[in-house]
Amino acid sequence: MNRLQVVLPGLNLKNPIIPASGCFGFGEEFAKLYDLSVLGGIMIKAATGEERYGNPTPRVAESGMGMLNAIGLQNPGVEGIIAQKLPFLRQFDTEIIANVAGSTPEEYEDVTRRISRDPVVKAIELNISCPNVKSGGLQFGTDPQMAAELTRRVKAVSEKPVYVKLSPNVTSIVEMAQAVEQAGADGLTMINTLVGMRIDVRTGQPILANRIGGLSGPAIKPVAVRMIHDVAQVVTIPIIGMGGVMEVDDVLEMIYAGASAVAIGTANFVNPFICQELITDLPKRMDELGIEHIMDIRGKAYGATLHRA
């Protein structure tokens, strides 16, 4: 028996550890360091309809217990990813999750339709934390009706299961989760970054050229755990948790809260071997805590009895 195996819609994960989108590129650099086949899955960098060059620099700023970033979805475009990036990933025995972003519902549909056809891709991660240019820049992920409609449209064209990535920058993440579940989402990934800002006191101006950025790292882990805990109690679809995971106990914490798998983001910048180390450390820590199978503890923080997927 594989004590770490997690089976989710479209995904047969040998373990629950997945590098998060935007923090692992397309795996090329990390593949020079270790065999990516050890990973449960890989969430690759976001794909948009056309190539994007990203925001002006500086794009990254350090913050206490975390970092701010405003990369701006830099990527070679969906056709560039399909032609240049996905072939490289075919050699690895791991589940590839394609992150899809856009500025209009039509762009999301187009990107999803194209990338979900590729046999390398096993699932879609729908990044709804993007501004809708047709709605005055309001983010898809901050309005339940808009998020639900986008989910429905993407589901209608996707050949693979769709996991919706939820933003914490909302009044009620529970309401958002329920809305996209009712619209047909196969799963959730959460949480995305918190919006933040840093100011250079020598100039009185924001450090980031974009002024604001997404806060990630250990500073946001308690927020992520609380939101996973709240959402897991009201949805029936699985959750891939993320937000500030730096060590093996952080992984267990998110699973206790209700996540089925855990994505690792900022920690990859601090320690490029972190995912490999977590996979090694997880069964050892489970032995110490008397945990037989990783799914035995899912949702136990709120007393739920959740069956093994």
UniProtKB/Swiss-Prot annotation:
Cofactor note: Binds 1 FMN per subunit.
Pathway participation: Pyrimidine metabolism; UMP biosynthesis via de novo pathway; orotate from (S)-dihydroorotate (NAD(+) route): step 1/1
GO CC field: cytoplasm
Catalytic site: C130
Enzyme Commission code(s) on record: 1.3.1.14
Amino-acid positions noted as binding FMN in the UniProt annotation, renumbered to this chain: S21, K45, A46, N99, N127, K165, I191, G217, G243, G244, G265, T266
Catalytic activity: (S)-dihydroorotate + NAD(+) = orotate + NADH + H(+)
Any one Gene Ontology molecular-function term assigned to this protein's record: dihydroorotate dehydrogenase (NAD+) activity
Entry keyword annotation includes Magnesium: no
Keyword Cytoplasm: yes
InterPro entries: Aldolase_TIM, DHO_dehydrogenase, DHOD_1B, Dihydroorotate_DH_1, Dihydroorotate_DH_1_2, Dihydroorotate_DH_cat, Dihydroorotate_DH_CS, Dihydroorotate_DH_I
BP terms from Gene Ontology: 'de novo' pyrimidine nucleobase biosynthetic process; 'de novo' UMP biosynthetic process
Class of the enzyme per the UniProt entry, highest EC level: oxidoreductase
Annotated substrate binding sites: K45, N69, A70, I71, G72, L73, N127, N192, T193
Subunit structure: Heterotetramer of 2 PyrK and 2 PyrD type B subunits.
The protein's role, per its UniProt record: Catalyzes the conversion of dihydroorotate to orotate with NAD(+) as electron acceptor.
Protein name, entry field: Dihydroorotate dehydrogenase B (NAD(+)), catalytic subunit
